[in-house]
């Protein structure tokens, strides 16, 4: 991991990863998107809903509100209760004169501390929730919980191949050469190259594969970006170590496989490329079926399979530890 820069009060991190396989960077991205422990709204009870929004959508919208509580704040998570109650006013016709825009500030918080629903980080304004028409009412209760799968604390987690400036210059000269001495045509082709074709001029290793990546991470505001990257690397390391403990199944003719119902593409793709680099006869991974939680890594090698897996573990863990040391 190269040096990194922080912005937006520490909630955005930009860095570069060098001499790593694309599967490793993508694995980090996948963990950041859906495997970081996150405090969420759960146990939603809809006691009254006369709006046009169906119950399922209302429940989903409540659960999507970002919570300004960290997973380690056990007391806050346990004792906080959330309620939204908006009934028609006690007027003779039980109607309002105009519609009402409900925001996150309209949720009543009963717990150890207020302000647990995040505001818009950039505008410092409450989040828009829904519009309530004059004759409509709503009453919702909920609590907090911690989820480790399928939730996210980031609004940006992405990477791209790093552009090799020397290669880009050569490619650009080649791209604009057909224009000859026509300055207008050269300028147009140069603009096209800078806006699009330059993406092909990425840094490559000796085997022509990308090895240098620009990585961007932005937190929605609960946990700083630097801490999120550290958590992702820690989780990745643990997943690697756990996967390597699975039994190796032996087949005929120096064929071996490892099956797991706990992991998928994150570990499978990384195992495939790092084992491939050991010059084995064959290696692949596959997800048995999209609806079945099973991933199989299969390889053929004259080398003892235990040594192959141990080398994979050493290299993969070293990649994670390089991040932990850098941040």
Residue ranges and their predicted role:
Residues 1-327:
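Protein-protein interaction/assembly regions in multi-subunit complexes
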